[in-house]
Amino acid sequence: MNIAVVTDSTAYIPKEMREQHQIHMIPLQVVFREETYREEIELDWKSFYEEVKKHNELPTTSQPPIGELVALYEELGKSYDAVISIHLSSGISGTFSSAAAADSMVDNIDVYPFDSEISCLAQGFYALKAAELIKNGASSPEDIIKELEEMKKTVRAYFMVDDLAHLQRGGRLSSAQAFIGSLLKVKPILHFDNKVIVPFEKIRTRKKAISRIYELLDEDASKGLPMRAAVIHANREEEAAKIIEELSAKYPHVEFYNSYFGAVIGTHLGEGALGICWCFK
């Protein structure tokens, strides 16, 4: 059985890596001043942060139109028998639900939607795993889904924001909490819990927040088992590179990626956000 892998743009897997692993991508949409852009295709992360700075306003975001999902699946149906369609958490987007609905609209391929319950390159790790399983001979979509569900036990992601105002605008914090938090220089560490973004711990400074995320990574990385990990930044590429250099020296058994919060996720976290995600291979 020929099985395809699809993910959406919020996995932030670079184009070259998608092509290398034969991973197909459906973009979410970003609306800037009434202009609609397809994330990662018509708007990359660098252009997004430049636009936000230039106009001092944030875009709105939306899931892919269901017609685009149907069209992608039908096109894949010409070469494949089934598709594993991996998407950002259903708790923050309707993309997974749209993929499930699109399944009933296509006849030439079986669609297996998968809710990653997370986003960014942590979501991308599921797509990479699915592609590896297929390359290594997996021929049952059900078995691949089972492996991905098992993988949820080891996927971790923690991140911090530089400006609480973005969380407040998105309804994550009250205005009073954001104001007081800014005065106290609180840098909340966030994570996904039950499919939504929630505070994990409140830390007083950026430096201490990053140190705490290091500690959380060490709980798994110190076991010495092969792992994937990514340092994810919101327009802080050099800072992410320095962190990777430091962590790679400490954990040579971990494969590190320098990744980013693109337009859709960056809209909700704001420039300066930083996180680390990881999983066992």
Curated annotation (Swiss-Prot):
Keywords: Lipid-binding. Hexadecanoate binds at T61, S93. InterPro entries: DegV, DegV_C, DegV_domain_contain. Residues 3-280 form the DegV domain. SUPFAM superfamilies: DAK1/DegV-like. GO terms for molecular function: lipid binding. Disruption phenotype: No growth phenotype, no effect on competence. Binds long-chain fatty acids, such as palmitate, and may play a role in lipid transport or fatty acid metabolism. Monomer. This is Protein DegV. It comes from Bacillus subtilis (strain 168). The lineage of its organism: Bacteria, Bacillati, Bacillota, Bacilli, Bacillales. The gene is degV.
